[in-house]
């Protein structure tokens, strides 16, 4: 009869322990109930990117001297620089410049080491397409300035919504 009493006491202790664990989990759940949602409705709401966000690369054709520093510092030798040597003035003339964003890792080395600052990172991050060949941008596509998220009146930015507080 004595082992039956100890089993009943163990069963009671296990029941109390299980109820305590369930109560702790429920308290954590309730502590999150008064917080605002963290998710955003993407096509209609967008995050404002940070100041040093590394998005699509902007290229200024007139500033480029075809030195190919961007190609040398790129870990995957990505930028394609076509140039022609002008023999009368002994300088390179840039013919074509392109970057394939399907391969680019957005490390920012090309922007950082460019001696003429003809490359810069933009806040544009919507580069998805159905055809991977559309991600190969030439100097005309790279020269296009992106529309700022803040200036787009059709989109509500996250900074205009209530602040998310960490509980």
Swiss-Prot record:
Cofactor note: Binds 2 [4Fe-4S] clusters per subunit.
Compartments (UniProt record): Plastid, Chloroplast thylakoid membrane
Binding site for [4Fe-4S] cluster 2: 74, 104, 107, 110
Pfam families: Fer4
Listed cofactors: [4Fe-4S] cluster
Ranges of residues in domain 4Fe-4S ferredoxin-type: 55-84, 95-124
Keywords (A to Z) from UniProt: 4Fe-4S, Chloroplast, Iron, Iron-sulfur, Membrane, Metal-binding, NAD, NADP, Plastid, Plastoquinone, Quinone, Repeat, Thylakoid, Translocase
NCBIfam families per UniProt: ndhI, NuoI, PRK05888.1-3
Function summary: NDH shuttles electrons from NAD(P)H:plastoquinone, via FMN and iron-sulfur (Fe-S) centers, to quinones in the photosynthetic chain and possibly in a chloroplast respiratory chain. The immediate electron acceptor for the enzyme in this species is believed to be plastoquinone. Couples the redox reaction to proton translocation, and thus conserves the redox energy in a proton gradient.
Family recorded in the similarity comment: Belongs to the complex I 23 kDa subunit family.
Protein name per the record: NAD(P)H-quinone oxidoreductase subunit I, chloroplastic
Gene: ndhI
């Amino acid at each position: 009869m004595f082992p039956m009493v100890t089993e009943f006491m163990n069963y009671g202790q296990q029941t109390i322990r299980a109820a305590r664990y369930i109560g702790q989990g429920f308290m954590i759940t309730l502590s999150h109930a008064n917080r605002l949602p963290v998710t955003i409705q993407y096509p209609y709401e967008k995050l404002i990117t940070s100041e040093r966000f590394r998005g699509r690369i902007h290229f200024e054709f007139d500033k480029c001297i075809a030195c190919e520093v961007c190609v040398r510092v790129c870990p995957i030798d990505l930028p394609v620089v076509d140039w022609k040597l002008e023999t009368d003035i002994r300088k390179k003339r840039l013919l074509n410049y392109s970057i394939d964003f399907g391969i680019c890792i957005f490390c920012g080395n090309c922007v950082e080491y460019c001696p003429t600052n003809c490359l810069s990172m933009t806040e544009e991050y919507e580069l998805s397409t159905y055809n991977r060949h559309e991600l190969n941008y030439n100097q005309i596509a790279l020269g296009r300035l992106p529309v700022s998220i803040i200036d787009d009146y059709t989109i509500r930015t996250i900074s205009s919504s209530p602040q998310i507080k960490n509980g």
